[in-house]
Design a protein with these regions (language model features):
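Sec/Tat signal peptide C-region and signal peptidase I cleavage site
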Residues: 17-21
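Bacterial N-terminal signal peptides
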Residues: 8-16
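Bacterial N-terminal signal peptides that target proteins for export
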Residues: 1-8
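Extended soluble regions of mature proteins
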Residues: 23-252
Length: 252
């Protein structure tokens, strides 16, 4: 709970950094990667139309130990989007890196911006909760690009860096780094607390193909896309299997 509260506060400090281009009729939608809310949030996938892809997302979460070492959890999961903006995502459990425990898929999710539906399906029970999906293909999704300057009331400072252009798994990306420094005493800290967020954004796909979030209380989260393809995926991925029971939760 303390980690979640800390990440919430950090997200508020990062939020003023967003100075993205907007249209008068459609404000920009900005969502940073990382964090936890019962489940690791990972990278944000918007329902952009006309930009299909499939990839495997590799996650590593390093947390500090009291003796100066680190404890690393990892997984790999599949993410797919079609030209209509529908998204299929697998959720695999995080397991110790290099250990004997094998990761497994425990949840898969299917979202449809046209039907405004979100199926959250548990593999153990073969039950899908049908929820409302509020994002649309008309939303103006933009990367969370900020500016440098002091935080309000002398609480610290923020720094924005443009890392230039590169190529990630054969796709052009633009890199950015945001650093927030919290002064001693602001959050019960006796030394400056530094949180960094680096990401490599693909304008073509409107997603981050590499994202690194490093916070003092939650550790370091690294998300890396691999096996990226920009072809139209199989349509059966966006259909709930017959053996799954659907429970409609949209009115709750």
């Amino acid at each position: 709970m303390r980690v979640r509260r800390f990440l919430f506060i950090i997200s508020i400090l990062f939020f003023p950094l967003a100075t993205n281009a907007q249209t008068p009729s459609q404000p920009a939608v900005v969502r940073p990667d990382g964090g936890t809310s019962g489940r690791m949030e990972s990278i944000f996938i918007p329902p952009n139309a006309g930009a299909p892809f499939s990839l495997t997302l590799v996650t590593e979460w390093s947390r500090p130990l009291g003796n100066g070492g680190t404890f690393i959890l990892t997984n790999q999961r599949r993410i797919v989007r079609d030209s209509r903006g529908r998204i299929y995502q697998e959720r695999w459990i995080l397991v110790p890196k290099g250990g004997d425990i094998k990761s497994r898929m425990d949840v898969f999710q299917i979202t449809d911006p046209e039907q405004h539906t979100w199926y959250n399906c548990e593999t153990a029970t073969k039950v899908c909760q049908l929820l409302k999906y509020h994002l649309t293909t008309e939303d103006n999704f933009q990367p969370a690009i900020g500016t440098s300057g002091p935080l309000a009331n002398g609480k610290g400072s923020r720094q924005h860096e443009d890392l230039g252009v590169s190529s990630t798994d054969g796709v052009d990306t633009h890199g950015y780094r945001e650093t927030v420094t919290i002064n001693p005493g602001v959050m019960g800290n006796d030394k400056p607390m530094v949180t960094t967020r680096e990401f490599w954004y693909s304008p073509e796909l409107a997603i981050n193909l590499i994202s690194i979030v490093d916070a003092p209380q939650s550790g370091k989260q690294v998300f890396t896309a691999k096996d990226l393809a920009t072809l139209e995926p199989e349509p059966n991925l966006f259909v709930v299997p017959d053996e799954y029971k659907i429970v409609d939760k949209r009115d709750e």
